C-alpha cells in the first residue's frame, strides 16, 4: 500500500511540474528547476521561443494537429544541450540553457534545433513547414537578474524576431 501511495504522490508531483500536452516543464516546474540549477556565478542563455503562424496551423489543420505540432516542437527543444524547457502557454516556450558562454555555441545549438524541427513529420500538415522565432539573451549572475531582467530581454528579442517575418533568431 505504501508503494502505491508513493507512486501516486510522485505522479502528482510530476503533473504539478509538467505541461500535460507536451511533457516539458510548466511555469511552476521551470521556476523550481531554475532554483535547483542556478548558482550565483552561473551563466548561459535564456530563450523565449514562439512557433510561427501557429494559429494558422490550427485553423488550416485543426487543433488535434496543432497539439501534435506542440508536442513535437517541445521535444525538439529538449535536444538543446544543458537545457530546461518549459511551455509558458499556447505556442510560447521558454528555454533555460545553463553553462553555454559563447554566442557561437548557442548558435550551433539553435542550428541543431532548426534541423530537428525541419525533420518533424506530421502528415496532417501537408506542405506546411514548422518554423519558429526566438529571442536568446545571455545572462551571468544571480537569480534575481535572471528573473527580472533577462526574461524580459529574451521576450523582447523574440518579438523582434517575429517582426522579421518569423523563422528568425535574435541573440543579445
At which residue positions do the language-model features occur?
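GGDEF/GGEEF active-site signature
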Residues: 72-140
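PAS/PAC or PAS-like capping segment
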Residues: 51-52, 100
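Catalytic-core segments of nucleotide cyclases and related cyclic-nucleotide turnover enzymes
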Residues: 107, 137-170
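N-terminal membrane insertion elements
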Residues: 1-6
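Amphipathic HAMP/coiled-coil signal-transducing linker helices
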Residues: 8-25
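Core hydrophobic beta-sheet residues of small sensory/regulatory alpha/beta domains
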Residues: 46-48, 171
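Conserved long alpha-helical elements within nucleotide-processing catalytic cores of c-di-GMP signaling
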Residues: 17, 26-45, 52-79, 86-90, ...
Amino acid at each position: 500500500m505504501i508503494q502505491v501511495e508513493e507512486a501516486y504522490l510522485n505522479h502528482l508531483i510530476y503533473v504539478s511540474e509538467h505541461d500535460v500536452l507536451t511533457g516539458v516543464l510548466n511555469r511552476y516546474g521551470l521556476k523550481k528547476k531554475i532554483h535547483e540549477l542556478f548558482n550565483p556565478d552561473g551563466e548561459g542563455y535564456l530563450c523565449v521561443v514562439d512557433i510561427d503562424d501557429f494559429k494558422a496551423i490550427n485553423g488550416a489543420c485543426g487543433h488535434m494537429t496543432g497539439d501534435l505540432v506542440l508536442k513535437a516542437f517541445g521535444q525538439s527543444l529538449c535536444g538543446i544541450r544543458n537545457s530546461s524547457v518549459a511551455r509558458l502557454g499556447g505556442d510560447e516556450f521558454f528555454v533555460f540553457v545553463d553553462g553555454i558562454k559563447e554566442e557561437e555555441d548557442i548558435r550551433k545549438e539553435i542550428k541543431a534545433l532548426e534541423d530537428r524541427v525541419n525533420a518533424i513529420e506530421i502528415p496532417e500538415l501537408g506542405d506546411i513547414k514548422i518554423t519558429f522565432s526566438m529571442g536568446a539573451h545571455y545572462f551571468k549572475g544571480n537569480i534575481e537578474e535572471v528573473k527580472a531582467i533577462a526574461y524580459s530581454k529574451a521576450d523582447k528579442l523574440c518579438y523582434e524576431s517575429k517582426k522579421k517575418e518569423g523563422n528568425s533568431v535574435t541573440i543579445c
